[in-house]
Amino acid sequence: MAAQRIRAANSNGLPRCKSEGTLIDLSEGFSETSFNDIKVPSPSALLVDNPTPFGNAKEVIAIKDYCPTNFTTLKFSKGDHLYVLDTSGGEWWYAHNTTEMGYIPSSYVQPLNYRNSTLSDSGMIDNLPDSPDEVAKELELLGGWTDDKKVPGRMYSNNPFWNGVQTNPFLNGNVPVMPSLDELNPKSTVDLLLFDAGTSSFTESSSATTNSTGNIFDELPVTNGLHAEPPVRRDNPFFRSKRSYSLSELSVLQAKSDAPTSSSFFTGLKSPAPEQFQSREDFRTAWLNHRKLARSCHDLDLLGQSPGWGQTQAVETNIVCKLDSSGGAVQLPDTSISIHVPEGHVAPGETQQISMKALLDPPLELNSDRSCSISPVLEVKLSNLEVKTSIILEMKVSAEIKNDLFSKSTVGLQCLRSDSKEGPYVSVPLNCSCGDTVQAQLHNLEPCMYVAVVAHGPSILYPSTVWDFINKKVTVGLYGPKHIHPSFKTVVTIFGHDCAPKTLLVSEVTRQAPNPAPVALQLWGKHQFVLSRPQDLKVCMFSNMTNYEVKASEQAKVVRGFQLKLGKVSRLIFPITSQNPNELSDFTLRVQVKDDQEAILTQFCVQTPQPPPKSAIKPSGQRRFLKKNEVGKIILSPFATTTKYPTFQDRPVSSLKFGKLLKTVVRQNKNHYLLEYKKGDGIALLSEERVRLRGQLWTKEWYIGYYQGRVGLVHTKNVLVVGRARPSLCSGPELSTSVLLEQILRPCKFLTYIYASVRTLLMENISSWRSFADALGYVNLPLTFFCRAELDSEPERVASVLEKLKEDCNNTENKERKSFQKELVMALLKMDCQGLVVRLIQDFVLLTTAVEVAQRWRELAEKLAKVSKQQMDAYESPHRDRNGVVDSEAMWKPAYDFLLTWSHQIGDSYRDVIQELHLGLDKMKNPITKRWKHLTGTLILVNSLDVLRAAAFSPADQDDFVI
């Protein structure tokens, strides 16, 4: 790029911070009022006595030659002067020379006139520590070796890097020049949103000056005429080693040591160790809470490695779909990206699971003067590589070639493919390209592929760029909380494509709280416009109501031009406050995008969501655990607050069909859930729906029948269905609702449960403790029977009734030992809470299966979902001890994580989940269902609920009840 383009890109003098968007306060530390007030000096201007401040770029000198390996890097020779614009990339910095810009290796350059350090002229540092962690720590404190020596906070003209704006472009905020400790004001700290996991936190030293955050460009000022070294601390770790490192080695060590500590938001999210707790119960409670926390969070780095985590919410738009030999199409939600699978893609009986995910930031390789990414990078994963056909990718891109012959002959659209996100990418021929829609056929399928579409002009010559030949659209998205509050923050994002995810995870990082939990923001609205060239954009936000205002100092943010050129997602934060918190209502936000000449490029309006309802209804998502201080704050769910509990009626089940038995069956291995019967007898069938499970040798289809006082399964081939007329040979007692209820609840007492989870669900979903107590058999007993203290809220009263049930069931003095699970489910069914019952039953089944399978869970995972060995290791990794082994008693934990993930992929049908789980267990060698038969009983239970409900509650009242 030409020098004048560089000057245009940097003429605003605004610093670029690490959050992929300029979030520095424009009004507090800058005296500039327009984009044209700062003059960019030539390299020679830095050598005069009164140099011009060089706002954004830091001058470095090359210490060795570098020949680029691709077109995104910058070529230079030893002794060349370069100007660094951004150092957030670790080993790679973004810089320019007098003709073009690109990435340079940080180890190949050295800051110019870097005198105030222990760096000698030879480029060597003596007595460095052996530990890379100490190297990184010391690099973060460079410039802080003056002990408690006071330095006047004024400007020094002999340092061209110390400008009058008092802003360090590599510091996250405006910092006064050399303040004393008592001058530090936390209110001046600029809150940032860090979205890239590679950003390091701010480090502050009490014995060092606060003008540096660890970048080697931040030079300490010295008084005029003084060039002596400042006194060095004797406890400096550089003096504790005999090893010598070169400057190049230091850069590599710094990058390596920084990587593991700043690779993720979740580096502190570690599994608890058993030795940290005094009892096994304490460790179990801590582990369950840790797993709940881990599954409710989203680590972008670990999401693909550990499929058992991060299930609650998708961060980037994704979908998983399973297709059979009939083929079909899979579309990425809320996008125009789809994959078409032809019929016969896999053999009959086989399935193909396709996973698609849109990655927001493209790799560096895809964007340059001759290339521009016009789609998100699509990650495609396939489970089955034994295929007979290719697949077709169709997507809508964010650019069209201009409608003139020269543009069409110079630039073309290309589909690129790679096995790695970072490349290298190879071209894939396009089947067709019509306007902004392209189709490409993917051959030689791999387990994981990355596909992107670019506009590419290989013959473009300087000073032209590919942007001159295309109409490139960028997408502006506005994200905010689910409900507005008296004070909240919104985020404006700029994408180089039209794939704006519905949810954006952000972490707000301040110097007081460097590692907060990420927050999920919702997409309020988005807007597309055509951008003629990559340039600095000024984004402004205004409110249409006087009650809400965007702070004057926060109304404008800047996105750098080179970010747009590289296709990086820019995220800008706008805090909004209400003048009168008592009068909250939705309002309209207007977003303006201006160019560097203050001309409005586009603007759009977005309506905000409503304030939260006054009832403060809890989210509908499942909460498995409660903290102690949250018990009194539980609010009933919307369903519970409107429920009228009907009366369970004991009467005959009338909606039965009957059949004639064609064969006599007597079983050697008795099974409570498989019926024995005599040829010629009649049998009542609860429905004609069939369940599938393994018999003595192979998988069969079964009816749920009632024969001589027992509910169980009968093989469909042994029954001739005759209709609703009761046969004369149908012996045994008549089936009533109370008998049916007692029969189908037989397996409940053999299921494992987590009491805290059950308690939370009931507190959220039952609105009347009186109805609950009556259904449990505690008829007409006062509240004082269940608790001594007076309870204020209905959820707490429900919890006290549940606690009483638990005590009675665990009381060994009772002559009749009751089952907690059975009594609870029976009471809920009598209250017509079928939706709550199936939710509890599915949780019980998954947990019980995990405990029963334990060490054989890998075999089950292979039968259910064809999980790879790497995925299995990822499920186990959070539960390994210090020796890297999962204890045999803890093996149920990865099994439970897998089953939860798998059940979410199956869908919302609790019947399908339990049916597929049963079939998967049947396929195992020496299946556990041979000895543990209660999963069969659970399958009967969930398939009989509709018949029970239809018979026990009058049809006239059904419409008044909520399940």
Swiss-Prot record:
Effect of residue 92 to A: Loss of function. Loss of targeting to the clathrin-coated pits and vesicles. Loss of interaction with DNM2, RRAGB and RRAGC. No effect on localization to the plasma membrane
A cellular-component GO term for this protein: clathrin-coated vesicle
Ranges where the SH3 domain occurs: 55-114, 654-724
Xref: InterPro entries: DEATH_SH3BP4, SH3-like_dom_sf, SH3_domain, SH3BP4_C, SH3BP4_SH3, UPA_SH3BP4, ZU5_dom
Any GO MF annotation of the entry: small GTPase binding
Keyword Membrane in annotation: yes
Record key words, sorted: Coated pit, Cytoplasmic vesicle, Endocytosis, Membrane, Nucleus, Phosphoprotein, Repeat, SH3 domain
GO BP terms in the entry: cellular response to amino acid stimulus; endocytosis; negative regulation of cell growth; negative regulation of cell population proliferation; negative regulation of GTPase activity; negative regulation of TOR signaling; positive regulation of autophagy; protein localization to lysosome
Organism domain of life: Eukaryota
Chain positions found as Phosphoserine: 131, 246, 251, 279, 296, 637
Domain ZU5: 317-454
UniProt note on tissues of expression: Expressed in all tissues tested with higher expression in pancreas. Expressed by retinal pigment epithelial cells (at protein level).
PTM info: Phosphorylated upon EGF stimulation. Phosphorylation prevents interaction with DNM2.
Entry note about domains: The SH3 domain mediates localization to the clathrin-coated pits and vesicles. The SH3 domain mediates interaction with DNM2 and the cytoplasmic part of TFRC with a lower affinity. The SH3 domain also mediates interaction with RRAGB, RRAGC and is required for the negative regulation of mTORC1.
Subunit structure of this chain's protein: Homodimer or homooligomer. Interacts with DNM2, EPS15, clathrin, the adapter protein complex 2/AP-2 and TFRC. Interacts with the Rag GTPases RRAGA, RRAGB, RRAGC and RRAGD; the interaction is most probably direct, preferentially occurs with their inactive GDP-bound form and is negatively regulated by amino acids. (Microbial infection) Interacts with molluscum contagiosum virus protein MC159L; this interaction is important for the suppression of autophagy.
Function: May function in transferrin receptor internalization at the plasma membrane through a cargo-specific control of clathrin-mediated endocytosis. Alternatively, may act as a negative regulator of the amino acid-induced TOR signaling by inhibiting the formation of active Rag GTPase complexes. Preferentially binds inactive Rag GTPase complexes and prevents their interaction with the mTORC1 complex inhibiting its relocalization to lysosomes and its activation. Thereby, may indirectly regulate cell growth, proliferation and autophagy.
Protein name as it appears in the record: SH3 domain-binding protein 4
